[in-house]
Regions:
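Conserved core of the PLP fold type I
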Residues: 84-290, 301-315, 319, 478, ...
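Short, flexible/disordered intra-domain loops and linkers
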Residues: 13-18, 55-61, 140-143, 233-243, ...
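Short, solvent-exposed loop/turn segments at secondary-structure junctions
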Residues: 48-53, 181-183, 209-211, 265-268, ...
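Long, C-terminal catalytic modules of enzymes
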Residues: 344, 351-356, 360-417
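Active-site PLP attachment segment
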Residues: 51, 58, 311-377
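Conserved glycine-rich beta-strand-loop-beta hairpin in the small C-terminal domain of fold type I
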Residues: 399-410, 417-435, 443-471, 501
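PLP-dependent enzyme catalytic core of the Aspartate aminotransferase-like
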Residues: 2, 11-21, 64-136, 140-169, ...
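N-terminal glycine-rich, Lys/His-bearing helix-loop that initiates the first secondary-structure elements
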Residues: 1-78
Length: 559
């Protein structure tokens, strides 16, 4: 297929400013045209949701749902109408049900889930089964609004374990929310509503980062001054390690920076902050900026070996966000939590507000309690999520909370971590398939790399393969987005631009989670072929194009 280079350049000029998630639609349009012309299916590796789902906890959920419906009909059954479940004796009724329907899908796990709460936490048998039964029926508002009592405890077990914490010392409270994206919205709104973050304040973003963090910060109602903390470390070969050098972390010593936002492991680099940087970051904040607020988004933590979250290593400073979407394949379920230690900087900053601002907040929350000053920040997030006045209807839907609990206990019961190792192996295998086609770029797997995405910096590749003259040629003759547009137009392959995540301008993101294994071989082949096509055109010119005097100067083009 012949690519109209001029039309691609015109298209980039028109849409190049868009978010990568909107730019993706333009790339899909090009890829679909290629699909029609060459008869090859489009490959969209721009999407982040995986192509696997956790089956057994879903089976347990739907089997338990049938039990719950029978419980409502036991109370009252009149044609299509039923009653509400009753607590007394419900555990024994469940045991009888599980014996009668012993072969029902997911029943073995379901019985283990029920027994987990009883054996691990000492839950009252009837109270535990009733909470789950009433919740899966969804006939009541969530009470408490932040999270169902026993459900919160089992979900906390999962969160603390996967985030590298200690259940014996963790004091985290959880707020169940509609996925990580809802958590982001709620958190920023509450920081502003409670006046511990104000319009125009200085915040730090650890980049590359999930694009909406950048876009939210620039919205007119926030208009934050952004300080970027770059994962700019490179190894001896000049390759990105996607770690944060000390000089970048030192930026947080500035006490005028009120908030730091981090995605860890990162998106799109998919690398967790290493232990050395975690320790250094903690020292900088505690010594130089003791009232810094941190929001860490750790959705990819389960794909990393021995992951440690800032919500566990720096609990006083850190508000944690976790989404179940990627690990369990539940982007459509909208399952996430906000986690905050009971002693935290957010509470203390609210207490330190001047009296005139405290009066405003007392008025805001006075309908909720006679002691509005004492409302913890996490409960303020809950109220703010429903404009305070609708606080009594706040909270994640109760059936969603049940599915969240089932996923959590399923993972906790998997002592051999069979499911976790499966998901890790899928991503790592697909990464190897890509690099089998790009041998000069092959990377070593280390324990900080998740391989959920892969970020390739085309300029680093160009320098490693052909030297600085080829880098200069690319800079002089191509727009950074041109590679992606040609990849879509010629091969029907959709990837995202790393620059849209505040990554290196010439970097591209490949999602390793959402296509079939064999598709990644094809993607690797296409990337390599297009790259070599650029190199062939450069070689054909037969002249030295480099205007760069030393390798050091080329570094300015790398980000």
């Amino acid at each position: 297929m012949t690519t109209n280079v001029q039309s691609i350049k015109q298209m980039i000029e028109k849409v190049g400013h868009l978010s990568p998630f909107e730019l993706k639609d333009e790339l899909i349009h090009l890829a679909q045209k290629a699909e029609n012309k060459v008869g090859r299916p489009m490959l969209n590796a721009g999407r982040g949701n995986p192509n696997w789902t956790a089956a057994t906890p879903r089976q347990a959920f739907f089997t338990f749902g049938q039990f719950a419906v029978e419980e409502t009909q036991r109370v009252w059954c009149e044609k299509d109408l039923a009653g509400m479940p009753e607590q007394a004796g419900i555990y024994e009724r469940f045991k009888r049900y599980s014996e009668v329907y012993a072969e029902a899908p997911g029943m073995t796990l379901l019985k283990e889930i029920i027994e987990y709460g009883i054996q691990k936490h000492g839950f009252n048998e009837d109270e535990w089964v009733y909470e789950l039964t009433d919740a899966i029926i969804g006939d009541n508002y969530p009470v408490p609004d932040r999270m169902l009592v026993q459900t919160e405890q089992v979900v906390k077990d999962y969160i603390v374990k996967e985030m590298g914490g200690n259940l014996l010392t963790s004091t985290h409270d959880l707020y169940a929310v509609e996925g990580g994206t809802a958590a982001m919205c709620y958190i920023f709104d509450s920081l502003m509503a409670n006046r511990i973050l104000k319009q125009g304040d200085k915040i730090a973003l650890f980049v590359p980062i999930f694009t909406p963090y950048v876009e939210i910060a620039g919205l007119p109602n926030y208009d934050f001054e952004i300080v970027k903390v770059y994962a700019s470390e490179v190894n001896e070969d000049g390759r990105h390690t996607w770690q944060y050098p000390k000089e970048e972390l030192d930026k947080l010593a500035d006490p005028s920076i009120k908030l730091a936002c981090i995605v860890n492991p990162s998106n799109p680099a998919s690398v967790a902050i290493n232990d050395e940087s975690m320790d250094y970051l903690k020292a900088v904040v505690e010594e130089k900026n003791p009232y810094l607020m941190i929001v860490t988004d750790d959705v990819y933590g389960t794909f990393c070996d021995d992951f440690k979250s800032l919500m566990m290593t720096m609990p006083y400073h850190t508000l944690g966000v976790y989404s179940y979407s990627k690990y369990f394949g539940v982007t459509g379920w909208r399952l996430g939590v906000i986690a905050l230690a009971q002693e935290n900087v957010f509470n203390d900053l609210v207490k330190q507000l001047p009296e005139d601002e405290k009066k405003i907040l007392r008025k805001r929350y006075k309908a909720l309690t006679v002691t509005p000053d004492q409302i913890p920040f996490i409960d303020r997030i809950v109220a703010d999520s429903r404009q305070v006045a609708l606080n009594h209807t706040a909270g994640l839907s109760t059936p969603q909370q049940v599915q969240m609990a089932f996923f959590s206990i399923f993972a906790l019961l998997d002592q051999e971590e069979t499911y976790k190792n499966q998901t890790k192996e899928i991503c790592r295998r697909r990464k190897e398939l890509i690099y089998a086609q790009l041998p000069s770029l092959a990377e070593k797997q280390d324990r900080y790399t998740t391989s959920y995405y892969n970020q390739i910096d085309l300029l680093v590749w160009a320098r490693l393969q052909y030297g600085n003259e080829f880098v200069r040629y690319l800079l002089d003759h191509y727009h950074p987005l041109e590679f992606l547009f040609e990849l879509a137009a010629r091969y029907g392959i959709v990837l995202l631009n790393g620059s849209g995540f505040e990554g290196p301008t010439w970097s591209i993101r490949v999602s390793l989670a959402n296509l079939k294994d064999e598709d990644y071989t094809e993607i690797g082949q296409a990337i390599g072929e297009l790259f070599e096509d650029y190199a062939t055109k450069w070689k054909a010119q037969g002249t030295t194009l480099s205007t760069i005097e030393s390798e050091g100067k080329i570094e300015s083009f790398m980000w």
